[in-house]
């Protein structure tokens, strides 16, 4: 059986880790709507420390959106999208939904962010040219099968919409190559199995709920309140499918197969924010919590993923040189020196001003 290492504030398990051979490393991000603000905080800490040892990236819904910003090396981008755009009435409007429209307007969100703060896809293209891969998960509307898309400049924004199209709330779904897709969280909210299938030996998983927490999705609870029982009937099979797949994924994380190693970064308690309709103060608190958890991960696990452990144990004493120079490890508190986009509208420079005390 593999190994699961929980990483959250107050958990000392990462402190006892010894050097190991990580092999192929994957970064996997869970969806969760506005709860993705926690993931944004974690990934902003990674970017601040220039920490990116990953070979493979997989995300669903909000996780795919967060990873898009990370892969394009745009610190503060995801935070800005969640706090300044998803809180606007143009995006989330219950009255529009009652009148027969969409509860969430993904088209407005994608078009507004693309025009006002575009993703730096050229940066991502260079990453892909180096051999790294990024997959976004969306669910087929006809049979609920999860599909994993490699984004390109041409389809990137459409795949984000497909991966985030919450059933019922974005009524039409998203058509890709003639097939309708819905939110990838229906079938694969945390694509850890796909990461393992693609050869990853070490998984870093960022959750948006406390570990081992089984829950009914927030969007379904809201739908229960806003719609009558008769209107919910067509979605019963979909919800049951989601709950079954989510439990299966959770069990996979708790008991990884073979020699798989899973580092699970998660909030120590339920977040203040919810999937939709969160208040800005709640989002701000959860972002800070994500930053702190990201910093804790870097201080405990990060160096083990960037340093190569010896393949064999030497039987003869190693010769120690007269002087040893040890470069300082990347520290999350250091000033950001990574090259980022020079387009001010594409980043959020205020992300670095958060009070983390």
Label every PLM stretch briefly.
Residues 1-58, 68-357:
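Patatin-like phospholipase
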Residues 59, 63:
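Gly/Ala-rich beta-loop-alpha elbow adjacent to hydrolase catalytic centers
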């Amino acid at each position: 059986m593999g190994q699961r290492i929980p990483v959250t504030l107050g958990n000392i398990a990462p402190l006892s880790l010894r050097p190991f051979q990580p092999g192929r490393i994957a970064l996997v991000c869970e969806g969760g709507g506005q709860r993705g603000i926690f993931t944004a905080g974690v990934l902003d800490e990674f970017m601040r420390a220039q920490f990116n040892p990953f070979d493979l990236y997989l995300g669903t819904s909000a996780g795919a959106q967060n990873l898009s910003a990370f892969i394009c090396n745009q610190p503060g981008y995801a935070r800005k999208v969640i706090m300044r755009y998803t809180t606007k009435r143009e995006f989330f409007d219950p009255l529009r939904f009652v009148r027969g429209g969409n509860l969430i307007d993904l088209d407005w969100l994608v078009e507004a962010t693309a025009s006002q703060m575009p993703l730096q896809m050229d940066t991502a293209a260079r990453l892909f040219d180096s051999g790294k891969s990024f997959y976004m998960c969306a669910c087929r509307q006809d049979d609920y099968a999860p599909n994993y898309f490699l984004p390109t400049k041409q389809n990137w924004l459409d795949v984000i919409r497909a991966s985030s199209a919450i059933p019922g709330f974005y009524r039409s779904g998203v058509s890709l190559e003639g097939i309708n897709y819905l939110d990838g969280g229906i079938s694969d909210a945390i694509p850890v199995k796909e990461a393992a299938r693609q050869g990853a030996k070490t998984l870093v998983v960022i959750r948006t709920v406390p570990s081992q927490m089984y829950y009914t999705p927030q969007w379904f609870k809201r739908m229960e309140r806003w719609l009558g029982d008769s209107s919910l009937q067509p979605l019963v099979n979909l919800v049951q499918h989601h709950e079954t797949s989510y439990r299966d994924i959770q069990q996979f994380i708790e008991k990884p197969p073979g020699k798989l190693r899973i580092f699970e970064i998660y909030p120590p308690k339920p977040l203040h924010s919810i999937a939709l309709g969160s208040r800005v103060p709640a989002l701000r608190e959860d972002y800070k919590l994500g930053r702190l958890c990201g910093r804790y991960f870097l201080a405990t696990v990060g160096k083990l993923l960037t340093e190569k452990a010896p393949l064999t144990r030497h039987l003869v004493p190693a010769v120690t040189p007269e002087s040893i120079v040890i470069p300082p490890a990347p520290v999350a508190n250091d000033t950001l020196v990574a090259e980022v986009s020079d387009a001010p509208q594409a980043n959020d420079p205020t992300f670095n001003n958060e009070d983390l005390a």
